[in-house]
Amino acid sequence: MAENETPLTAVKVEALVVMKIMKHCSQTFPTTATGSIVGMDVGGTLEITNSFPFPVVEVPPESHFDNAAANPAAAAPRAKANTVYQAEMIRMLREVNVDANNVGWYTSANMGNFVNMNVIENQFFYQKEMNERTVALVHDVSRSSQGSLSLRAFRLSPKFMTAFKENKFTSEELQKSGLRYQDIFVELPVEIHNSHLITSFIHQLQTPNIPAPTELPSSLAALESGPFVKSSILAPNFDNLALSIDPFLEKNCDLLLDSIETHHTETNNFQYYQRSLAREQQRISAWQQKRKQENATRAALKQPLLPEDEWQRLFKLPQEPSRLESMLNSRQVDQYARQIDSFVSSTTGKMFAVKGNLLPGETAK
């Protein structure tokens, strides 16, 4: 029990598990891929040693199920059939002496669009038990295709778990609890671990010889005929100086604008609720004032008074919409903004390099 009370501080993933997750997510791209991860908890570090994908039950097009999920793969981790499948797989892994403790699930993402209700409900399904030490691994296929692996680990914060369990996402409840969109997820650092044999093999690989320093070329012709241009090494790579806008950055800007539009729609819906509530409250106040005057007249005539709480039967206050969707959308906007901020750093440097040719009235010196 004392070990279970230690909070999770990091996630260590075996390199083979990372490769299996990448392969599964790439094969199903652009649709969502989900699967289970197994391992063990060692001193607050969650070690993930194996994984396996979830089967997706395809709903036939002629099916008329009203409760069928719009995206079966995204809802697969909490499906009843997959719960049985996962238990059977873990039992088989134990028979071959493999670490078979359920430590969470993984999912694929595209352009960082993983902040949605499916991810929230799946992680809540795994994390709802007391001290349930599970994480959600998110692999962004589009981001990884740019050359750097994007694998992140998330848990739902205790504050959000309490609010989601009680379904308290009204403005009053959010003000009392102080829950913000930044408090939805808790991100844990991810470390990729290789076995000692693989590490030894990597160190035994031959490294390319470092060329001796050469003198600077005296002209452009000397630079073009130099050894660096004819070599196959990546640097210097003059393609990096191109000013073309990265299509990945352009797509992120489009997604950011769509999320901001959704945010404005949610804001307009909430403002409509506030106007409707104000109108109903004015009608109730007018009715109560009129009823008080009637009771004052009846009291003067020594007649029985009319009930003053009858307005609860005559009037119906509008139901406040849940603020959960607005919170998730705000967290998604923050995710897109962070991605764009990391992408524009290289482009900004190029723009400053040619500043004299871009700004009117200035020339390059």
From Swiss-Prot:
Quaternary structure?
Component of the eukaryotic translation initiation factor 3 (eIF-3) complex.
| Record InterPro entries | eIF3h (IPR027524), eIF3h_C (IPR045810), JAMM/MPN+_dom (IPR000555), JAMM_MPN+_peptidase_M67A (IPR050242), MPN (IPR037518)
Any one of the GO CC terms: eukaryotic 48S preinitiation complex
Report the protein name in the record.
Eukaryotic translation initiation factor 3 subunit H
- To which species is this protein native? Aspergillus fumigatus (strain ATCC MYA-4609 / CBS 101355 / FGSC A1100 / Af293) (Neosartorya fumigata)
Q: Which family does it belong to?
A: Belongs to the eIF-3 subunit H family.
- Gene Ontology MF terms in the entry: metallopeptidase activity; translation initiation factor activity
Alphabetic keyword roster: Cytoplasm, Initiation factor, Protein biosynthesis
| Physiological role | Component of the eukaryotic translation initiation factor 3 (eIF-3) complex, which is involved in protein synthesis of a specialized repertoire of mRNAs and, together with other initiation factors, stimulates binding of mRNA and methionyl-tRNAi to the 40S ribosome. The eIF-3 complex specifically targets and initiates translation of a subset of mRNAs involved in cell proliferation.
Q: According to its UniProt record, where is this protein mainly located?
A: cytoplasm
In the record, biological process GO terms are: formation of cytoplasmic translation initiation complex; translational initiation
Tell me where it resides: Cytoplasm
Domain MPN: residue ranges: 11-160
In terms of SMART domains, this protein maps to: JAB_MPN (SM00232)
